[in-house]
Swiss-Prot record:
This is Non-structural glycoprotein 4. HAMAP family: ROTA_NSP4. It is a single-pass type III membrane protein. It comes from the Viruses.
Length: 175
């Protein structure tokens, strides 16, 4: 690991890259030289910049691991987007957050189902009581003395002048 930050090691890597690039240039049929050179340059820069940064970040704080992890995931997702892929790499923390959100939603729905089930049970009990109250019971003798309509009944003989007071009479109107 100490070789990564060493100047001589860096120069030897640059020299080997230059030798590789010069051998590619000598081939006249090489049409993708600029693309290969830019990719190699980016990879070398990432290699040289990320290793010492990771060392320093890991030594200074404990949360730097998460920061580096998110940086690496972002870089990988960028490469995937450049390559045309729609899929993305996710970290374990993001998956855990999504799982927590799903579990919360499931708990909320279970509580709602529990409340609805309790209400339905109460409604069934209420309907049973109403049904029990509506069931007709057979009675042998009906006592009509307690009926309101039966107290003031008069027969035709008991009416004054023997005439039904509820029958309409003829009315003469002047014009």
């Amino acid at each position: 690991m100490d070789k990564l930050a060493d100047l001589n090691y860096t120069l030897s890597v640059i020299t080997s890259m230059n030798d590789t690039l010069h051998s590619i240039i000598e081939d006249p049929g090489m049409a993708y030289f600029t693309y290969i050179a830019s990719v190699l340059t980016v990879l070398f820069t990432l290699h040289k910049a990320s290793i010492p940064t990771m060392k320093i970040a890991l030594k200074t704080s404990k949360c730097s691991y998460k920061v580096l992890k998110y940086c690496i995931v972002t870089i990988i997702n960028t490469f995937l987007k450049l390559a045309g892929y729609k899929e993305q790499v996710t970290t374990k923390d993001e998956i855990e957050q999504q799982m927590d959100r799903i579990v919360k939603e499931m708990r909320r729905q279970l509580e709602m189902i529990d409340k609805l089930t309790t209400r339905e049970i109460e409604q069934v009990e209420l309907l049973k009581r109403i049904h029990d109250n509506l069931i007709t019971r057979t009675v042998d003798v009906i006592d009509m003395s307690k009926e309101f309509n039966q107290k003031n009944i008069k027969t035709l003989d008991e009416w004054e002048s023997g005439k039904n007071p509820y029958e309409p009479s003829e009315v003469t109107a002047s014009m």
